Amino acid sequence: MAKINLIKRSDYDRVLITETLPYETPIIFSNDGLYDCIKGQSEASPFQKSLVDALILGKGPSLATTCTQPYLYKIRKNSLEYRRLALLHPISQWKIREFYRRYEKLILHYCSHSPASIRAPKSIASTFYSKNSWENVYKYKTGAVALESLDGYAKHTPSFFSYRGCDRLYKFFTSVDYFQLEKRFQSQMTLDVSKCFDSIYTHSIVWATKEKEFIKKNLRAGSFGDEFDVVIRHGNHNETNGIPIGPEVSRIFSEIIFQEIDRITIDNLKDLKFDVDYVFRRYVDDVYIFARDESITKQIYSTYSDSLMSFNLHANAAKATTQNRPFVTKKSRLIFGASDCVNIFFESFLQDEGRGVLIPKPIYSPWRLAKKFIDSIKVLCSQSDVDYDEIASFLISSITERIKRLVNSDISEMEKEVKRGYVSAIDVMFEVL
């Protein structure tokens, strides 16, 4: 019989681990210490308690209302540009924790309006797990969220909510949904929102959450948008233009706004029926439009652009692309090509035993293996006229998944030669990172 292990649903402190930090932090940096400080308050000394009260809980007349300024740092976006991320002050992170505690159900409600979103919170992440081969799927630090399909199986929840759809955009291009859309519709068009998070007007969360009938039945809903606005601004020096880039809570903030933009767009296309005459799918701020012909996709693009402008957001016309079947974008072509390279690479020195278990094959020249893979990626990028940055996230994700499966193996009872094989396999993968 499967072993059931309870994960406390009432443990809102886990928000501090999953929702308030950027994913792109050094691997040695986490909020585990912050979480432990909160959990150890009952046994802490008076001095420790006073520090936590002042620096985390924000207790005191001067700290309760004062906004905080995030620590800003940059990560590489591509060969020329950088992306600026925000590390929120602990007091602001605690305010986010309290907001989740009060409004978790309303967050789910406002993230359920759009049929177009392919990355949206669906439910509170699993309250229990069964001992099985999938329990460690989220053990290691990644940029993923908990998918609804694995909810109830995963031991290490990477997000407070379980999500419907895809945790990575590239998975959409290889999904059944994408292939079904290609069967049904002749034309595809892409829409990119210009400088999305930097351009979001924080007060627009109130515009997106004003539902009179729902608010009448749920009195606290009337203050949801206002409070979310205050919480986000508190961690960003009280700025109303732009939201902190990096934390998952910012993606949820934007998701609620975009759900309303999706809904307005569908309502304004009165002469067309969604999921019959056209469909669009949205991953955060990337929109993919599908329709019978190009004239309809352009009509939908124009309508969606108008909906964006009502929230002070704008489509980036320079990045718009249109194509007819077969739908092979530069991005999807890269992913398909990289997927082939990755599979050939791993099959040359790893054997899949099923149930998530990988066994290393004999490796005679780690450098030769690594170089062959690197050369194949070079050729792919050269043929597609792109930099490594375009497929870096896909490659890192693929390699990370294999490393996780290898290190989950119990090698304590294995012979020394077999153990050496595991180390060699991991060395090969680190060589190409």
Roles of regions detected by a PLM:
Residues 95-102, 204, 256-264, 303, ...:
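Amphipathic alpha-helical segments that form well-ordered structural scaffolds
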Residues 34, 38, 47-55, 96, ...:
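Generic structural signal of hydrophobic/aromatic residues within well-ordered alpha-helices
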Residues 117-124, 212-218, 222, 270, ...:
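Short, surface-exposed, charged/polar-biased interaction segments
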Residues 294-372:
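Polymerase palm active-site segment centered on the conserved acidic dipeptide of motif C
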Residues 1-245:
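Conserved two-metal-ion catalytic palm core of "right-hand" nucleic acid polymerases
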Residues 84, 275-279, 314:
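Short, surface-exposed helix-loop/turn micro-motifs enriched in polar/charged residues
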Residues 105, 270-274, 313:
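Short aromatic/hydrophobic-glycine micro-motifs
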Residues 180-284, 289-298, 349-433:
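Conserved polymerase palm-domain catalytic core
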